[in-house]
Each structure stands twice: as structure tokens, then as C-alpha cells.
Amino acid sequence: MLTKMYVALIKNLTLQDFRDRYAGSVFGSLWALINPIVMITVYLLVFTEIMGARLAGSSNLSSFSIFLISGLLPWLAFSSTLTRTASAFQEKKSIITKIKVNLSFFPLYICFSEFITLLISVIFFIFVYVLFLKQDINILLVLNLLILFCFQQLFAYSLGLLFGVLNVFFRDIKEFLTIFMNIWFWMTPIVWVPSIAPEWLQKIQENVNIYLWFLSEYRGIFLEGNTSSIENFGPLFLIAFLVLSTSLILIKML
């Protein structure tokens, strides 16, 4: 279980990780706010104002921008959490060898740090979504979104931990994961609309691509105002639990 020492360690590592990203820069941690502001603003200007792109059958001029941003922001956190967790044991070897830590919980600081970054980005997006795009979102949908983010980060952490253990034994895992995540990104309808894909690819996506479930839920919230049904969380939690359990078993071999 997490003791007070581990909680303090993870808290300090989380804050340190967040600060280290912008260490030495003039604006410091303000870049955590500046980056999403610039990215979201550029997407809205390019796809809404310049290209006038919108989803088929939608009268909302900003529908494609919402479609893109609502999928891209969570994916960036998911991908970064997974890949960074997979490298944590190697990158923080100096700390692990000096301090007795529980390897199962040690990389949690990455999960929390990326979660904070995601929240900052999404808060600004919701601000733009409501005030400038004139869309509605209620507290229930926001809570639903937070629960989804927690499940996503749990899933990313579980996978990252599994790859992190394998990375100790097989150093090629880091390079493999870079290629794998790139393929996963482009095979997931984040920047393209699912309906343009061949039917055979759509079936594979529905049966194999777990992240597609997250994507559908996020877009259901922002594009349709739908809340997730409770039964949808069960299978995903089970998968994350199985992956995490496998990782914890392998960690005991280290």
C-alpha cells in the first residue's frame, strides 16, 4: 500500500516533473497554459475560419474543430503517460538505486503530471467551447469527463508499467513503443472521420482498438452532450485491472 513516504515522494516528483518541463524558460510553468491556448486557437482558426471544415450533416461551423480537439487533447496525455511510464525505471535509475521505493507505484508521478497538463488544456478548451463556440456543457458532463480521464490515465499507466518492466529485460522496447504509438495514433480516428475508413477497418477498430471507446465517449460529450452509461466502464476497468495485475506480477521478478 502507499505509505506517507511514498505519497510524499510521488507528490514531490509530480511537482518537480511539472516544473522541469519549463525549467530555465522565461515564462516557466505558464507555458503549460500558453501551449494549449496557442494549439486550440490555431486549430479553430485553420479548420473553422480558414478551411470552414465541418462534419457531414452538421450545421455547426466548428463541428470538425470540436471533433479534432476533443480527441487530440486526451490522446496526447494518454500517449505521453504510456511512453514516459515505460521509460521511468531506466530514466530514474539513480533515484531507485539510492532510495528503497515500491516500483509498482513509483512511476505514478508521470500519470499525475500528465493529468494536470491535460486538465489545464481541457479547462481552456471548455472555456472556448462555451464562451466563443456558444456550446452548452453542464456539471454532470464535466464530472463524466473527469471520470473518463481517470480511467484513461489508469489504462495508460497500466500499459506503461507493463512495457516498463519489459524494457528492463529488452531494451528494444523503447524504440518499438515509439513506432507502435505512432501507428496506433494514425490507425485511430483522431484526425480523420471514422466513416471514411473501409468497412473492414471499421470492424477491426471496433473489436481491437480499445482507445476508440474513449474517443467515442469524449466526442459524445462535446458533440452530442451525451453521458457515458455506467456499464461501459466495467469492461474497460477489467482490462486495465488485468494489465496492471500482470505488470505487478512481472515487477516482482525485478
Placement of each model-derived feature along the sequence:
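Hydrophobic transmembrane alpha-helices and immediately adjacent juxtamembrane helices
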Residues: 1-254
